[in-house]
UniProtKB/Swiss-Prot annotation:
GO terms of biological process kind: immune response-regulating signaling pathway
Native source organism of the sequence: Homo sapiens
Effect on the protein upon substituting residue 321 to N: In allele KIR3DL3*00101, allele KIR3DL3*00102, allele KIR3DL3*00103, allele KIR3DL3*00601, allele KIR3DL3*00602, allele KIR3DL3*01302, allele KIR3DL3*01305, allele KIR3DL3*01306, allele KIR3DL3*01307, allele KIR3DL3*017 and allele KIR3DL3*026
Signal peptide residues on this chain, from the entry's feature table: 1-25
Recorded consequence of changing residue 77 to W: In allele KIR3DL3*010 and allele KIR3DL3*028
Gene name of the record: KIR3DL3
Effect of residue 348 to P: In allele KIR3DL3*027, allele KIR3DL3*029 and allele KIR3DL3*031
Extracellular side stretches: 26-322
Xref: SUPFAM superfamilies: Immunoglobulin
Record-given protein name: Killer cell immunoglobulin-like receptor 3DL3
Cysteine pairings via disulfide bonds: 49-95, 144-195, 244-293
Stretches assigned to the Cytoplasmic side: 344-410
Amino acid sequence: MSLMVVSMACVGFFLLEGPWPHVGGQDKPFLSAWPGTVVSEGQHVTLQCRSRLGFNEFSLSKEDGMPVPELYNRIFRNSFLMGPVTPAHAGTYRCCSSHPHSPTGWSAPSNPVVIMVTGVHRKPSLLAHPGPLVKSGETVILQCWSDVRFERFLLHREGITEDPLRLVGQLHDAGSQVNYSMGPMTPALAGTYRCFGSVTHLPYELSAPSDPLDIVVVGLYGKPSLSAQPGPTVQAGENVTLSCSSRSLFDIYHLSREAEAGELRLTAVLRVNGTFQANFPLGPVTHGGNYRCFGSFRALPHAWSDPSDPLPVSVTGNSRHLHVLIGTSVVIIPFAILLFFLLHRWCANKKNAVVMDQEPAGNRTVNREDSDEQDPQEVTYAQLNHCVFTQRKITRPSQRPKTPPTDTSV
């Protein structure tokens, strides 16, 4: 059966719905997308059509956008794996399940499911003001911005199947942005967020997702304690260990430094004194700062305790001088080794060249006895001429023979 026939059957249902009140309403199927309606270009998505009456045959139709050839002349059972998706797959889908009690043989159309394809434009940026750690009951502003002039933005939280939140972008010369105020903050609102951008004439073709932004609600549990070993004052270049502990049964501890976005995370360990503790090794330390730690549970990774009291870590010594010294050493030492190696090779090559340039033995007449007498008295001097080492044999004037050597050549 062609898609056109199935679509006409679905439309025909509405024309005949009056005489058939028992068909439709609660009998219409339910269409869902797994793992979600936001799909990266090149990935797959499963469309599943469920009927309350247990019928497992269904057809799919796409209401807008470009047609999808793989839907034509197809009757599906239970589910349909669609992909690798392209921008052509973006749009609104419905399904009709087989229905023997309907005059058309098909149920009413299902709920609409909008498939949005990401990766069509470059990604925007997502920020949180005043920051991603939000006290319970307070408000945070999520700002999505881009140098592309997007008329629409979508805000999506990972792990939920609901459609992304659609927001109207504010255009300006440098691009576009949108601000979304979220609160009062509760654990239900915390999570990992991403945003997307789109243009008006292609609303379901989205940009690549922004980098993930973790929104954390803090202040739900009692604060842990933070200490430094061997102490909060550290010599530049040395190591320090920050210990976060509590009698609460926290699974994970988080360590953060003021004015920094990132955080360190370690699993809590039960100590003999009955506390749950995590030790964060830091170093070599070059800069100080105020540190805090938080506790959380694995079941609620975005719900943290109150922060510990701030622990100021100070660094003594000239850290800048330490950096300069280390950097200079890294440059000078390899250069000195290379220079020594090249100079050694140069001298060896020069010495070989001097030996090769000596006169052949046949052109010189040397008395063996005279030569033997002169050898211990010969002195080798190294002369530096224009940074080049040459060797010369010089006979001391006081030791020169008074009579020329006898010519023994024939």
